[in-house]
Amino acid sequence: MYSYQTNFIKKGSTKMNNMPKVKIGIVAVSRDCFPESLSVNRRKALVAAYAAKYGMDDIYECPVCIVESEIHMLQAVEDLKKAGCNALCVYLGNFGPEIAETLLVKHFDGPAMLCAAAEESQNDLMDGRGDAYCGVLNASYNLKLRNLKAYIPEYPVGTAEECADMIKEFVPIARAIVALHNLKIISFGPRPLNFLACNAPIKQLYNLGVEIEENSELDLFEAFNKHEGDERIPAIVAEMEAELGAGNKRPEVLAKLAQYELTLLDWVEAHKGSREYVAIAGKCWPAFQTQFKFVPCYVNSRLTAKGIPVSCEVDIYGALSEFIGTVVSEDIVTLLDINNSVPADMYKEAIEGKFPYTHKDTFMGFHCGNTASTKLAFCEMKYQKIMARNLPIECTNGTLEGDIAPGKITFFRLQSTADAQIRAYIAEGEVLDVRTKSFGAIGVFAIPEMGRFYRHVLVERNYPHHGAVAFGHFGKALFEVFKYLGVEEVKFNQPKGMLYPTENPFA
C-alpha cells in the first residue's frame, strides 16, 4: 500500500521520486606505447574541472587506468560496480587500447560515453602528445565491430573543462537510458472507440527494454471501489484544497478524486514488480465518467507532478514520451493535443508584430485538464465541457483548467507507428504570453516553421495528435536519447531552405 505523505510539487520545486540518480564512472585508458601517466594526469585534471564547475555528485573517478589489458578492464568494471556507478565515461587520455576500452563498454552494465583529451600545449608535443584524436577513430570502429552503443559528443576531443561539459551533457541522456531499462508502463482499458490514433504496437516497447502491464478498466473500477472510505483520503483532500486555493470550484468531487489517486498509487506499488519506475496510460472516456462519476484529469496532473506521468486516452507511447521528458528535464511535463489553429483576429491582435512568428507558426495545444497547476498561469477545477454536451455535468467534474504559463517548450514524441516501426520527432518553441480565451488546459504555442513541420512530419509520417511537452529547450538531449535507443528516424522542424523529402519545391 502506498504510504501517503504530503509532497505535491510546489512552484520552484523539482523533487520527483520516479527516476534514477545517475553516477558516471570516469575510466582513463592508455595505449601501452604511451606514458600511462599522461592518461592518469589528464583524468585527474578532468575530474578536478568537473568538480570545480558541477560538484562531484554525478561522477566517480575510477583509480584503475586500463593499459592494453583485459585484466585491467575487469578490475575497472568491478571497481565501478562497488562504487555504485550506473553509467560510464571512457576517457582517452592518449591513443587508448582499442580492444580493452571497448570491452569495458561491453562488460559494463549501463549506458556509456566516450570522450578524449586534446593536446595541451605546443611546448609539449614530444613526450606529452597523446594522439587521442586518432584513438577515437579506432575506438568507434571497434564499437561497431562489437555492435556496441556509446554516446559520442558532437566534437568528442577537448580540454579538461570541455570534456567536463561533455560529461555533464551526458547526465540526462544516461538518466533516460537507465530509467527506460527499469520502466514498466501500466495501462488501463483499450483505447476509446474511434481512436485508432492511440494504437500502440507493444513490440517496440520490448525492443526498448520497457515492460508493459495491460489491464481492464473493470480491474481499475474494482480497485477504486475497494478504496471507498480509505483513511488516507482526508489528507489528500486537504492537499488538493491547498493546491487549488481559490480555484477550488468543485469541492464536492475532491473526495472521489482522492480515492482515485490512492487507487492508482497503490496499484503502482503492488504491480511495478521487478521494475523501479512506472508510467501510466489511463482511460478517461467514454464509460469512465458514467461509472466513476468524475473525470480523472486533475489526478493525472497531480501524479505527473510527482514524476509518474499519466497519459490520457490509453496513449501508451504518449506515457512513454512523457516519462522520457520527465527524466531528461527533471521537471514536470504534460501531454497535449496538437489541437486547433489560432484565429486570424487573435493573431493580428496579440501576436503579429509582438513576436517573431508567422500565423502558420502558431497553434493551440490543448487537453481537457491534465496539466499540473505549477505549469499553468492560473487554474480552476472545472468540468469537462466537451463531454458535458452529452452527459450530466456532475459526471464530468475533475478537469484542471487554465492557460499554460508562457515560456520555452519542447514538443516531442516517440512512437511505434501504424507500420510498427519506431520513429520520433522533436521541435523546440515556446508558449506565448497570449490569453487563449478558451477552455481546458490550453496554450498558444509557436514553433518556427510549424506549418511545414505539421504537414511534412506530423501528417506525412502518420503521427497521432498527442504530443509530449517539456517545459524548456531539451531537443539536444532528447535527440541523443533517441539516437542511443536506435531510433533511425528523428524528425525536427526544418528551417526555411531545407526541404522535407515530400515537400513540393515549386509550392
Language-model regions: role of each:
Residues 16-52:
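N-terminal basic/disordered segments at the start of proteins
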Residues 17, 21-24, 57, 116, ...:
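Cap/lid and interdomain-hinge subdomains that line or gate substrate/regulatory clefts
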Residues 85-94, 113-115, 277-282:
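Periplasmic-binding protein-like
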Residues 72-85, 102-104, 263-273:
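Short, well-structured alpha-helical segments in soluble
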Residues 1-15:
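Short, Lys/Arg-enriched N-terminal segments with co-localized hydrophobic residues
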Residues 304-436:
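C-terminal catalytic subdomain
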